[in-house]
Design a protein with these regions (language model features):
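Alpha-to-beta junction loops
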Residues: 2-9, 143-153
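Short Pro/Gly-enriched coil loops immediately N-terminal to beta-strands
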Residues: 28-36, 171-179
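Short helix-initiation/N-cap motifs at beta->coil->alpha
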Residues: 1, 129-140
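Periplasmic-binding protein-like
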Residues: 58-79
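A bilobed periplasmic-binding-protein/Venus flytrap-type ligand-binding module shared by bacterial periplasmic
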Residues: 35-53, 179-192
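Short, well-ordered beta-strand elements
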Residues: 95-107, 125-131, 195
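Ligand-binding "clamshell"
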Residues: 16-28, 160-172
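Immediate post-signal peptide segment of exported/extracytoplasmic ligand-binding proteins
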Residues: 81-101, 120-121, 190-194
């Protein structure tokens, strides 16, 4: 940051770089952003028990609390009315002993999924979190059916990806936002912009 006056950085990049958005940003975007990070599945799998179990677990109070307690506002849950982590329409007895696979980026997505893993384990369902550090493979492995779901992107990115790659991956849940922050480099306040 020393080479620029200001930099706009997404919390997804700030956190792994050791930058704390809530204390280091001069200003931050609010939680009403259109760029919520989503859980996505292959089109046609939106209503499977695996998907519904995953949605319920990611929509849980446990996940919302984990996000609030661990990211200090750098990641904000957008789930309204979080539940207990389970969907009463899912046949968890039939899912018992199965594995649900999710492609995710390491931070914060895979970290958040660790909470989901514990929730699903209560019903004897294994969550296999497969970490990716790129933004192409997670959609390809879901579209091919190799992986059940992914959690790493926002809807505008997914829509562009589908259009450019003829894939059929759809959003089933908005989970959180990673607000953009404006950080000072050579400048330490917003005074230079106010002129």
């Amino acid at each position: 940051l020393q080479d620029v006056d200001y930099a706009v950085i997404n919390s997804n990049y700030a956190l792994p770089a050791g930058i704390n958005p809530t204390t280091d940003a001069l200003v931050m975007e609010g939680s009403s952003s259109a760029y919520s990070n989503i859980l996505a599945v292959k089109e046609g799998n939106e209503e499977t028990d695996k998907t519904k179990a995953l949605v319920a677990a990611l929509s849980s109070k446990q996940v919302a609390d984990y996000i609030a307690e661990n990211y200090d506002g750098a990641v904000i849950s957008v789930v309204e009315n979080p539940g207990d982590g389970y969907d009463e329409t899912v046949d968890y007895d039939a899912l018992s002993g199965t594995t649900i696979s999710v492609a995710a980026t390491p931070s914060p997505h895979a970290e958040i999924l660790s909470v989901v893993k514990d929730i699903l384990a209560e019903k004897n369902v294994t969550l296999n979190i497969i970490e990716y550090t790129d933004y192409v493979q997670p959609n390809k492995v879901v579209d091919s059916g190799e992986v059940d779901a992914n959690y790493f992107q926002h809807l505008p990115y997914l829509e562009d990806f589908n259009a450019e790659n003829n894939t059929h991956v759809v959003s089933v849940l908005a989970v959180h936002v990673e607000p953009m922050g404006l950080y000072g480099g050579k400048q330490t306040s917003l005074d230079a912009i106010k002129k």
